[in-house]
Amino acid sequence: MIEDFSSPNGWDVLWEEHEAYQSCASIKDSMRDTYAMGLIHTFSDEFKELYEEYQGNYNDEYNTKLSEIFNRHDNETIDKVQESLIELKDYIYGFEVDTGKSDIVTQKVGINLCWSGDAVYSMDTAEENEVLLYFAIPSYCCNIWFDAFSILSEVKDERLDAAYSFLDFISSPLIASENMDYVGYTPFIAGDDVFSLVEDWYEARDVDENDEYIETEGTIPYDLSYFFRTNEDDETEYVLYVEEDQINRQMRAQYPMEEDLPHLAIMQDFGETQNNKIVSMWEKVKVNPLPIWVVIIVVGGFVGLLSFFGSYKLIKKAKIRKRKKLREK
């Protein structure tokens, strides 16, 4: 399964009549994230052509072209994505916002389109019950998501100072590492405190009597230098040796491999007009029109119930009148 979703064809698998995956995937009830998924599938041929054109040389130029396709939101694109997402509903379990991270642990669903921190939560929780879950990044394109704090433009004086102080506080490496330890989400902050926490979590080598790492079978190098180096002149090697399955588990969810980065794109703002159109499109996708035969049965059943209860009340009234007449005699 993990190979299917990590492949260039990773997103498209969900749109196929696949016995193992049919009706077992939950998708985010999140307009932007699911629009991104639908767009990647809709233009999968273009993404694949680009992927093959730059095979082995995924650079900034490649990412720029990738992002151009990924950020289409013209009217024609919106209509095509809507068709793709409506079609997707025939193959999935349903939409969710927050239950997916638990549903996949309890095996109510088998696949979940998830945010990285939720993926870590699910994998950690399942592992407590001796169940292994895996995290996949489809290789030709994936959405970069992030949360952010914002300061209102009209805030002034001491409130503005307080806001900046709070941002400084949560952005310090020590506090960032404590937050990551609590919620499982990766901060944009580097620093030794954060790296030490990641090292505590994932470094799998044994140590000798001098507390020095020694070569350990079943571990592979995982280079995080791209993230933790402080500047271009920093030559520090931030390499962990992790268990082999971490390539598709918590490590990959929290810190993608450097080779993943060119295939990741950031969705830009749609603009007010197109954003409203995509909101409208998303509402149409989520509406679940019932087949006419279901409507007939439901309405017929409802009318039947009304008729039954109506008849029941008439019969009851007739019996009451009859008893009254008997008492009068």
Q: For the regions a protein language model found, what residue spans apply to each?
A:
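Conserved C-terminal helix/tail region of periplasmic/extracytoplasmic solute-binding proteins
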Residues: 225-329
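Tryptophan-centric aromatic hotspots in well-structured domains and transmembrane helices
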Residues: 6-15, 115, 145, 185, ...
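Short, well-ordered beta-to-alpha junction loops that form the rim of enzyme active sites
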Residues: 29-32, 114-117, 182-184
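Extracytoplasmic ligand-binding site segments that recognize negatively charged/polar headgroups
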Residues: 1-108, 122
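Mature extracytoplasmic/periplasmic domains
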Residues: 149-254
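Extracytoplasmic/periplasmic substrate-binding proteins
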Residues: 90-157
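Active-site catalytic pocket residues across diverse enzymes, especially alpha/beta-hydrolases
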Residues: 42, 126-127, 183
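Non-transmembrane alpha-helical segments in soluble domains
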Residues: 12-15, 36-39, 82-86, 101, ...
